[in-house]
Amino acid sequence: MPELPDITVYLEALERRIWGHELEKVQITSPFLLRTATPPVSSVEGRKVSNLRRLGKRICFGFEDELWLVIHLMIAGRLHWKAETRKSLSTRSSSKFKAQLALFHFDAGTLSLTEAGTQRRASLHLVQGEAGLSSLDRGGVELFTRQKPERKGGQPALGEFIDLTSFSRVLQSENHTLKRALTDPRLFSGIGNAYSDEILWHAQLSPVKLTQKLSDEETARLHAATRDTLIEWVERLRAETGEGFPEKVTAFRTDMATHGRYKEPCPRCGTSVQRIRYAANETNYCPGCQTAGKLLADRALSRLLREDWPKTVEELG
């Protein structure tokens, strides 16, 4: 699922292409995509884009008269840009593995929304004003104070990161595991499965440690790791994208430290990266750096193996 760094780079690429441009036509090709009936989606046609912002993991397109188109890509939704007119584009997806859900025809080109796989989770809402946006807001604190600040060095800065006191207050407002707290949209905005793994690796903290059991030093470490990890990945993705459009958005990157790196060596200590699987998600961590050599129980396998489930890295052989 695209998270804060991915959405940030999407927004910057969109700003260069559609800010101030007219949305001529919205073409919805999936009956499952649009989740609102009023205002009608046709009401944004003929209007110019006057704002772009992130709301959690959603991308918000602002138009005149305070109309907002809000896209949630979920796990497999992706955006694509073609500098072509709508007359020259087909409504068919170019890949049998991706379904085309919608086309947004601007006077400068066409933005398409696709979703891989068979499940249709991506969504589109059209809402009115800040009240409409608030209805989609899960309530998590924004980690960076400004979403569209002054540009610095040709790139928009992310703004000031949340201070340690505020971060700690939100983090410890409920007694959750660190993994759950970082990915809870009611607590923090924009962090998901991938970057939470990277943050916890940088902080050298166990994903199952409880938030209210953290020492002041551990909280400060997590605060710094969250800031540094998100900034680092925004900068990496900016460098990868350049002036183009982000077409390689993925949660699994070869230069990540732990996420998606099961059984590969930790880049810091060399210990094999391990995983905890639950439902459709997987948490990756380094036992050597994060859990003092202890293997965390994988719910499915530990039930199957019972006493044979290894407890430490050494028992893996």
Model-derived features with residue positions:
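Basic, nucleic-acid-binding surfaces and adjacent catalytic neighborhoods in DNA/RNA-processing proteins
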Residues: 22-40, 53, 79, 166-317
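Acidic, proline/glycine-enriched N-terminal capping motif
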Residues: 1-134, 288-296, 302-317
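Phosphate/anion-contacting hairpin/loop surfaces
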Residues: 69-202, 210-213, 217, 222
